[in-house]
């Protein structure tokens, strides 16, 4: 199976075959524009490299101008890599959430009872496989010391991202 579908396991970014997602904001919402967070000198190059990696993968794109801007920072991980985090709290306060039921682990484990084998798969960059429509890309603009970048894919930190992702996964199954 790995040999037959080796392109699915190469570590690259996949593309969920669904129409681009449109994020909905509450009526009369004005764009939210924040200043960039200061980045400690020790982390500047690391953050810049992570942004460039995400641009190369097609997750981010340099934004020429946007009325929206959410600040971004990095959190070092124990394995030496970093997680880029965008502070979407102000955007989230203006988004309309459409809750989708997210299954509880305990329920899933009960369904597996009696099986002799189980497999765990990690969907590499799962949210990033879902494209955003142009208006949502604009709303998901981040600001850094090097300018603005817009997310082309569903970013982590958007309050409705888990609902959107779970709905797509449930429909896939």
Q: Where would I find each of the regions flagged by the language model?
A:
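Reverse-transcribing Pol proteins
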Residues: 1-100, 147
């Amino acid at each position: 199976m790995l040999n037959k579908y080796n392109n699915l396991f190469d570590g690259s970014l996949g593309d969920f075959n669904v129409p681009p997602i449109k994020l909905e904001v509450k009526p009369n919402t004005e764009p939210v524009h924040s200043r960039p967070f200061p980045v400690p000198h020790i982390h500047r190059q690391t953050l810049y490299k992570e942004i460039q990696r995400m641009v190369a993968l097609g997750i981010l794109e340099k934004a020429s101008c946007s009325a929206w801007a959410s600040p971004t920072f990095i959190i070092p991980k124990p394995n030496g890599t970093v997680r880029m985090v965008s502070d979407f709290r102000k955007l989230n306060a203006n988004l309309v959430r459409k809750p989708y039921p997210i299954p509880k682990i305990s329920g899933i484990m009960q369904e597996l009872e009696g099986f002799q084998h189980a497999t765990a798969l990690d969907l590499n960059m799962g949210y990033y496989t879902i494209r955003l429509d142009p208006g949502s890309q604009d709303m998901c603009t981040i600001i850094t010391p090097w300018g603005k970048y817009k997310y082309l894919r569903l970013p982590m930190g958007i309050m409705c991202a888990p609902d959107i992702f779970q709905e797509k996964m449930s429909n896939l199954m």
